Amino acid sequence: MPLSHTTWAPYINAKLTPEQINNIKQFLDVQYQEQSIFPPKEKVFAALSMTSLDHTKVVIMGQDPYHGLGQAQGLSFSVPDAVPAPPSLQNILKELATDIGPRASHDLTSWAKQGVLLLNAVLTVPEGQANAHAGLVWEPLTDAIIQAVSDAGEPTVFILWGKFAQSKRRYIDESKHLVLTAAHPSPLSAYRGFFGSHPFSKANQFLTQNGRDSIHWLE
């Protein structure tokens, strides 16, 4: 996998068996040959390539990539600016505007480069088939990533929106890290506790209290 040269590799190799790693490689080869898969193959591991373990300050968990053409870029919730923001991302930006201020761009690459690990639990999706790759090969890898941050990382903020993301809470050492939970930003649930949750300012407060640089969320 392209992750072999990254800071994540030792933890992935420790948590996953060689068979599991090989299954991921084979899965990628077969899926991208047979059908339209998102994100583009070279961006499947974008979150882990852009945000190293030692630089991770915040983790924002997603479920799986957007399944529309041109949307997914390997970062949870993020889409290129050339593509309209999906409803959940629109609500994330609304909450950010209320919490800290307005952000013009809905491409969240700058967050990733600052240390926000934008991690989906499932890293691929077939076109038009949301969550179709859940339960196949990805969860052991992404669960290992969460555990790596919890075990080896400095004090970090885990932002878990919705029940699915919150199911990952069991992998996090809350004596060392901050876990922020709220309803999912989907239009179906955003008014049931997502709006008004102030995750961005709370994250920065925790980071500065623990001697880490805050995130410039508006950049």
Curated annotation (Swiss-Prot):
Active site: D64 (proton acceptor)
CDD domains the UniProt entry points to: UDG-F1-like (cd10027)
Location(s), subcellular: Cytoplasm
Entry GO terms, CC: cytoplasm
Entry-linked InterPro entries: UDG_fam1, Ura-DNA_Glyclase_AS, Uracil-DNA_glycosylase-like, Uracil-DNA_glycosylase-like_sf
Enzyme class label: hydrolase
GO molecular function: uracil DNA N-glycosylase activity
GO BP: base-excision repair, AP site formation via deaminated base removal
EC number: 3.2.2.27
Predominant location category: cytoplasm
Keyword hit for DNA damage: yes
Keywords, sorted A to Z: Cytoplasm, DNA damage, DNA repair, Hydrolase
Segments forming a coiled coil: none
Reaction(s) catalysed by this chain's protein: Hydrolyzes single-stranded DNA or mismatched double-stranded DNA and polynucleotides, releasing free uracil
UniProt keyword Signal, yes or no: no
Function, as annotated: Excises uracil residues from the DNA which can arise as a result of misincorporation of dUMP residues by DNA polymerase or due to deamination of cytosine.
Family membership: Belongs to the uracil-DNA glycosylase (UDG) superfamily. UNG family.
Annotated protein name in UniProt: Uracil-DNA glycosylase
Gene: ung
